[in-house]
Amino acid sequence: MRNCPTGAITKNRFTIEAEKCVTYYNELWGKDEFPDWIKPSAHNCIVGCMRCQNVCPRNREYIHHFMDIESFSEEETTFILEKKEMSNLPEPFIRKLEKANLKMHYNYLSRNLKVLLI
């Protein structure tokens, strides 16, 4: 609970308050900017938020199991930052997004990446 950067996990609830959760704003919130109350330091992933997952005792056995994906080139990172239209992206880059399960998140990767680069 202490590790949640926005206080979305509280002692008196057994659920996560989605309206305070960084993952909600990274993945579902349809606006170009994050709310002012979310500090830039709260962001830690291009999609989602792993702080609660990383410290959860139930995850100890599994937390080190992750998918190693290819790195994005400078050119590919520029595609993301400039929000290049999906229809204009090179096919190998689209396949890389699909392999990393990021294609469905492409529309807001630019916003999410920019806040990580601050």
Task: Name each model-derived stretch.
Residues 4, 39, 103-107:
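Glycine-rich, flexible loop segments associated with nucleotide phosphate handling
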Residues 76-86, 97-99:
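Alpha-helical adaptor scaffolds
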Residues 33-40:
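Short linker/helix segments within small regulatory modules
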Residues 89-97, 101-118:
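Long, compositionally biased charged/polar accessory segments in the mid-to-C-terminal portions
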Residues 1-30, 42-73:
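Iron-sulfur cluster-binding cysteine motifs and their immediate structural context
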Residues 29-32, 86-92:
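Short amphipathic alpha-helical segments, especially helix-boundary/capping motifs
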